[in-house]
């Protein structure tokens, strides 16, 4: 047994992986006058027709469609393609194993690209639901079956056999009826019999009635499932049974088998659901005795009429399953005809969603579909006449109008007085009971009058004994300065919000409390308001915040309320850092939060306060133990209700409060918790005022509500999703109360720990353990972020100051100036920089300097030098400080200067094409002092005659030349590197007199592509020559149409921001050392 199941599971997984993106790759065979129907021929069907018969029915339907289109003047081709399952894995006749088969058929269509205009089938609920769950099915699907609730509200699914939803609506309506001559009592209880031998339709009908969150279950005060024949037979004569009504599904033979000739209590009513059986309408059919206390719910033959007498020639040509396949083909033909006549495309989404709210001509007559694509029809409730032993129509139910019409107002029932009994045993209109009730009523009336008088006396006495008084202001203490509001793990903590919150927090009776503004000026409360405040004082429940009283501060009245450390539930949902989804806010925790709110509201509704009136996620707070508590309840006569996203639609239209309105608000909060999105999240609308307007003015069967994606919900989530949707029903009477919500969530919550009940302490300890583990994870994560930010700050500091200087500043707070015996200093500037600026915009100048200096910085990375600063077009570099390197300082500066000069020979300005950029370079070696100057924006500066001499060497040099002093040449001669240089001659240096200087031209055995210096020796001739070059470059730019760079606040916008300001420019920090 395990091997087939394992193979089936693996096959299902492979199919799901293969079908994830199926719809986008399938091409429809639905164009150019040729239209196909894809029929899924599934072996795994529990319905009473062979595949050969179904194929014949579909082909007959296609012929009818062709004839109808031809009569309408539409010459097109309509065909049906039949897709069969292959292999031996699908041989079971059980619909429960049809999941993989349906996906396999879709895979076949996908791989062979045979998708038609519409899918016909499958019929099994399991298969249909899985296809919609695992694929993005954007094509219309017509099903002869798919009865389950899980297939409700699918946008492209059409069902041509009555689904379970229609059955539930009838039962709820019939249970409510109490004004028919034969049914004077409304029913609120039922037993539901279910075993493992039901047909496919019965299985899903009874499954819907069993579901705890279904519409039927919500309306009953008692419902119990009977499983197995023994339980059914025991309940028939059980004097202690809780209901007289038993619902079952099957045929008359099923009733006979279960009863087995046993006696049945006279007030027992069996409701037999047998929708697709025409046995009851056949001629000469006599109802057996065991059917006399049975009411049969069925569908009439397609050609019958709605009255109590049956024609003798009524019979069904085909069974309902075959007829549904035939009508499915005719439905497609009807829609195809409409679209072709309008000349609209049938491959669009509009066609897929068009199978709604229509009536078409079926094989046996008109067929009507509702707004969900489900078939509408008229159900018959039959009874057995004790006079004629014939089946007769008791009433009819129109599923489209939800209307029950009594047909036989004087039925000849087997039950007493020809009336249906009460659903609760022992209740009925007996004369003795009437007398007892009359006497009891008189006594109760007298007692009621006495109680009213006593209650009024007690209330007046209580007000006299405890007149409302405020808490003395001197008992309210402000928070101390070292007390914080909350613990936050966010690095960018919002201090402004913290200040606002502190204004509302105080201490009372050594406890931290919140002051709630009651919008009351003088504090002279009315008697009604005092009663409300007294009720609040009496509430003490662990899921409700404690109310301590009121206090008057600064001519304002505040309510003093218990403080919860973690803030509102809305803040917790927004804080994805402290409460992440993956490790903390999981599905179990969300269920526990919903359970906490439900318990608090259930207690509040059963208390004297009775209603909240302002329930929303900001009025649900979380304490230090991760327990959710409800606050801001009561005081409805003091604080007027407001219109917001949590307000029920009936209260938006007319301002008031109610318990059912609280249930609606709970549903909105639940959607916030489940999706962890903003309040009333929906993709179709973002504006808050528009949302409120659409909720208030919504009408029809599908009112405006937030998004809750049932299609993608997991199996464990589906029951909660349905519960939430029931909470925001438009009709308040259809919403469950909080007691039922609490019980449903208690059952779901217990399943997480394989237990039905968990103590409060167990829940509390488990939550704190979960939060502790999450806190450890967050602390570790924040520590890593802190270290990363610290390293980032260090890298930035190392770019601004030398590493040794930064460490000294961090450790000692000061940097001692230091004298260096011998260093080499480099200066350079741009020749004609002012002239270039004259013909350039400011942003072009910035771009030019950025392009040049970032290239210089890259060159510095390959030498042991330290960039001191840049001022305008001047560029200063030193070697031998702050880290001493022997005689290497002169070598590194000399090679760096050669690399820079070589680069300038290839550099070209973007906004002045063809213009060479000339630089002058000066180098000098000698002693130097260095230190940090200033407190704000500290700079590492160099001092001494060596700095001035190096500057003079640059200023007295010539374009595209490296001007070197004699001291530097002397050092280079002492090294192993054989530098090439030329004697310039005697040069006058301001402050030093005349000295012999040199031109550095290269290194032996190394090639440097140095640019050729300009030939002019006269400075004025050089300047004139340079101006001519600029003019020529401007003419060239104008002729070639080169545009200036777009002005921007960030230079080099097209290439990125200034690279020497970025921290991650290079991992090589040798630039500075």
Swiss-Prot record:
Family: Belongs to the adenylyl cyclase class-4/guanylyl cyclase family.
Record's protein name: Guanylyl cyclase C
Signal sequence range: 1-23
Record note on quaternary structure: Homotrimer. Interacts via its C-terminal region with NHERF4. Interacts with the lectin chaperone VIP36.
Topology in the lipid bilayer: Single-pass type I membrane protein
Catalytic EC class: lyase
Domains: entry comment: The protein kinase domain is predicted to be catalytically inactive.
Keyword Manganese among UniProt keywords: no
Free-text description of this protein's post-translational modifications in UniProt: Glycosylation at Asn-79 is required for interaction with VIP36 while glycosylation at Asn-402 modulates ligand-mediated GC-C activation.
Protein kinase domain sequence ranges: 489-749
Domain Guanylate cyclase: 824-954
Gene that specifies this protein: GUCY2C
């Amino acid at each position: 047994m395990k091997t087939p199941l394992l193979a089936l599971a693996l096959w299902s997984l492979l199919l799901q992986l293969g079908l994830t993106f199926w719809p986008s790759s399938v091409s429809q065979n639905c164009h150019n006058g040729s239209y196909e129907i894809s029929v899924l021929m599934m072996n795994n069907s529990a319905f009473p027709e062979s595949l050969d018969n179904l194929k014949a029915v579909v082909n007959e339907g296609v012929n009818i469609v062709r004839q109808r289109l031809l009569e309408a003047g539409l010459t097109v081709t309509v065909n049906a393609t039949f897709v069969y399952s292959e292999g031996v894995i699908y041989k079971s006749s059980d619909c429960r194993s049809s999941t993989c088969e349906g996906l396999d058929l879709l895979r076949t269509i996908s791989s062979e690209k045979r998708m038609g205009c519409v899918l016909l089938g499958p019929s099994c609920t399991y298969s249909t639901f899985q296809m919609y769950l695992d694929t993005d099915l954007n094509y219309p699907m017509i099903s002869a079956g798919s009865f389950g609730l899980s297939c409700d509200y699918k946008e492209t699914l059409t069902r041509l056999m009555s689904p379970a939803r229609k059955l539930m609506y009838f039962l709820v309506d019939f249970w409510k009826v109490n004004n028919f001559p034969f049914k004077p009592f409304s029913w609120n209880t039922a037993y539901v019999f279910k075993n493992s031998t039901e047909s496919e339709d019965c299985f899903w009908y009874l499954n819907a009635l069993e579901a705890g969150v279904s519409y039927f279950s919500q309306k009953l005060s008692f419902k119990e499932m009977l499983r197995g024949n023994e339980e059914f037979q025991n309940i028939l004569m059980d004097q202690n049974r809780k209901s007289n009504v038993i619902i079952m599904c099957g045929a008359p033979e099923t009733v006979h088998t279960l009863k087995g000739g046993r006696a049945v209590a006279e007030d027992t009513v069996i409701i037999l659901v047998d929708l697709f059986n025409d046995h009851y309408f056949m001629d000469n059919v006599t109802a057996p005795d065991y059917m006399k206390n049975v009411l049969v719910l069925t569908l009439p033959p397609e050609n019958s009429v709605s009255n109590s007498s049956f024609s003798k020639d009524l019979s069904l040509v085909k069974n309902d399953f075959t007829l549904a396949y035939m009508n499915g083909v005719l439905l497609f033909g009807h829609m195809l005809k409409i679209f072709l006549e309008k000349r609209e495309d049938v491959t669009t989404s509009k066609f897929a969603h068009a199978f709604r709210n229509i009536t078409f001509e079926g094989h046996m007559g008109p067929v009507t579909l509702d707004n969900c694509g489900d078939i509408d029809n008229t159900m018959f409730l039959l009874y057995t006449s004790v006079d004629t032993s014939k089946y007769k129509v008791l009433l009819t139910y129109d599923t489209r109008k939800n209307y029950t019409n009594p047909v036989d107002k004087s039925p000849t029932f087997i039950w007493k007085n020809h009336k249906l009994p009460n659903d609760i045993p022992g209740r009925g209109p007996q004369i003795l009971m009437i007398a007892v009730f009359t006497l009891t009523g008189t006594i109760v009336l007298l007692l009621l009058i006495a109680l009213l008088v006593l209650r009024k006396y007690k209330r007046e006495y209580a007000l006299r004994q405890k007149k409302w008084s405020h808490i003395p202001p001197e008992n309210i203490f402000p928070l101390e300065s070292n007390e914080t509001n909350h613990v936050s793990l966010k690095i960018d903590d919002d201090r402004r919000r913290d200040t606002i919150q502190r204004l509302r927090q105080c201490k009372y009776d050594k406890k931290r409390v919140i002051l709630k503004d009651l919008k009351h000026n003088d504090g002279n409360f009315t008697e009604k308001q005092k009663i409300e405040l007294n009720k609040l004082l009496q509430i003490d429940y662990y899921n409700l915040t404690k109310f301590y009283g009121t206090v008057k501060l600064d001519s304002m009245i505040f309510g003093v309320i218990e403080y919860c450390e973690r803030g509102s539930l809305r803040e917790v949902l927004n804080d994805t850092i402290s409460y992440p989804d993956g490790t903390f806010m999981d599905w179990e925790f969300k269920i526990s939060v919903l359970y906490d709110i439900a318990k608090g509201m259930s207690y509040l509704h059963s208390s004297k306060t009775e209603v909240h009136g302002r329930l929303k996620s900001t009025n649900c707070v979380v304490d230090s133990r991760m327990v959710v508590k409800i606050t801001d309840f009561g005081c409805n006569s003091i604080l007027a209700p407001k219109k917001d996203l949590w307000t029920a639609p009936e209260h938006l239209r007319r301002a008031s409060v109610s318990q059912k309105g609280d249930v609606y608000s709970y549903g909105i909060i639940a959607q916030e918790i489940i999706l962890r999105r903003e309040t009333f999240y929906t993709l179709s609308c973002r504006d808050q005022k528009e949302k409120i307007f659409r909720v208030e003015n919504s009408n029809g069967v599908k009112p405006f509500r937030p998004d809750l994606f049932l299609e993608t919900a997991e199996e464990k989530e589906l029951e909660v999703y349905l519960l939430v949707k029931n909470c925001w029903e438009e009709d308040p009477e259809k919403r469950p109360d909080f007691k039922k919500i609490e019980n449903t969530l208690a059952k779901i919550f217990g399943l997480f720990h394989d237990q039905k009940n968990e103590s409060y302490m167990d829940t509390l300890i488990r939550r704190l353990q979960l939060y502790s583990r999450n806190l450890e994870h967050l602390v570790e994560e924040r520590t890593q972020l802190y270290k990363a930010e610290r390293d980032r700050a260090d890298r930035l500091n190392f770019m601004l100051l030398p590493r040794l200087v930064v460490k000294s500043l961090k450790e000692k707070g000061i940097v001692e100036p230091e004298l260096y015996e011998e260093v080499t200093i480099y200066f350079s500037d741009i020749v004609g920089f002012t002239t270039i600026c004259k013909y350039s915009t400011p942003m072009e100048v910035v771009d030019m300097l950025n392009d040049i200096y970032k290239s210089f910085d890259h060159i510095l990375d390959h030498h042991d030098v330290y960039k001191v600063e840049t001022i305008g077009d001047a560029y200063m570099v030193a070697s031998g400080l702050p880290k001493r390197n022997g005689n290497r300082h002169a070598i590194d500066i000399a090679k760096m200067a050669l690399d820079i000069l070589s680069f300038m020979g290839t550099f070209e300005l973007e906004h002045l094409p063809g213009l060479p950029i000339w630089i002058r370079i000066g180098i000098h070696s000698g002693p130097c002092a260095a230190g940090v100057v200033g407190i704000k924006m500290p700079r590492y500066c160099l001092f001494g005659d060596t700095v001035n001499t190096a500057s003079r060497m640059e200023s007295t040099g010539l374009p595209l030349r490296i001007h070197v002093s004699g001291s530097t040449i002397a050092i280079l001669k002492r090294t192993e590197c054989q530098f090439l240089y030329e004697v310039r001659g005697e040069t006058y240096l301001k402050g030093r007199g005349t000295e012999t200087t040199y031109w550095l031209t290269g290194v032996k055995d190394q090639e440097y592509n140095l640019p050729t210096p300009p030939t002019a020796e006269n400075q004025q001739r050089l300047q004139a020559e340079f101006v001519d070059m600029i003019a020529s470059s401007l003419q060239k730019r104008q002729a070639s149409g080169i545009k200036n760079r777009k002005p921007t606040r960030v230079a080099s916008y097209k290439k990125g921001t200034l690279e020497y300001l970025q921290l991650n420019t290079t991992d090589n920090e040798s630039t500075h050392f």
